[in-house]
Amino acid sequence: MMPKTEEPTYPLCPDETKYEKLAKIGQGTFGEVFKARDKKTKLVVAMKKVLMENEKEGFPITALREIKILQVLKNDNIVNLLEICRAKATPYNRFKSTVYLVFEFCEHDLAGLLSNPQVKFSLAEIKKVMQQLLNGLYYIHSNKILHRDMKAANILITKTGKLKLADFGLARAFSDKLNRYTNRVVTLWYRPPELLLGERNYGPAIDLWGAGCIMAEMWTRSPIMQGNTEQHQLTLISQLCGSITAEIWPGVEKLDLFTKIELPKGQKRKVKERLHGYVKDQYALDLLDKLLNLDPTKRVNSDDALNHDFFWVDPLPQDLNHMLSRHSKSMFEYLAPPRRRAPIHQQPQQPGVVRPAGHNPDQHFERIF
């Protein structure tokens, strides 16, 4: 891992004033994201501000990771980092240099599109979204990279319907050796059960769980498991996917938190039953069932998911450009009203705080890009 004090090698522009900021489209603990335009070329871009609050620590590790990984990943379904811009140190910024990551501009994120009831996805268009998402995952996993923050807000879509995986601040390289990665990754509502139970030797299956959550969201229009705490999230997972036991998931009893957390007992698996009210396609339900497998060793991988019958029977995947051409305004989660909670679960006995879908229970991971 590159030390924090080492600067990244990437095309640099000397001054961020070459861009005119047009609108703020994102906000989080990482800073702000702006839609901007190159004053000379008129190219529209997205500028992600990198917070440099503690310069003694050097370049922030999340931004450094994102830059390093995006230098390697070049694919139609991965957001393209164009350059890095520095703002000059002035009295206005307390003589602290501000850094911006400049990305290609995508008109929408998936969470923003799903927040708008006027945006209607046909089954064929949902297939196209998921096909592109899984193709992006297949590409990064083939290059030994884990995304580790799969969620609808991190799925960007251009006005012509091209899908881009974005926000690689939590991404990292992985190997097939025994590893000890942090399990404090992935936004809570999309976090797979193995991470919630303390697994540190994980792989691409964590991203496929997130893909399953996002796929279900294409019909429910809201995150399907909105836990308030890790315990609550495990309860919701058990209610949908069945009780977590060594019988259905061999080896789970070895995970650090398996005996320390009270897990619901006697829960039957109800993925197809609970989602059938939204998802009428039998092939879609079958793929969802495979993506939301509790056991990561049995969870379908991106290659097998792309070969699933869901994508190869009528209606075949259909480009999104015609549907999106009816919507002239950009749609981002940051700019959208809260989405309603998806009523696919019976709520647990303890009272829960009802949070809008735009709210992230893990503030550390709240990002748009």
Model-derived regions, located:
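C-terminal lobe substrate-recognition/regulatory segment of protein kinase catalytic domains
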Residues: 243-289
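Activation segment signature within eukaryotic-like protein kinase domains
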Residues: 129-130
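Conserved N-lobe ATP-binding subsite of Hanks-type protein kinase domains
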Residues: 32
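Conserved HxN/HPN-centered segment at the entrance to the catalytic loop
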Residues: 75-85
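Catalytic-loop of the protein kinase fold
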Residues: 141-158
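Conserved N-lobe beta3->alphaC-helix segment of eukaryotic protein kinase catalytic domains
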Residues: 44, 48-74, 89-92
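C-terminal intrinsically disordered, low-complexity extensions immediately downstream
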Residues: 312, 316-369
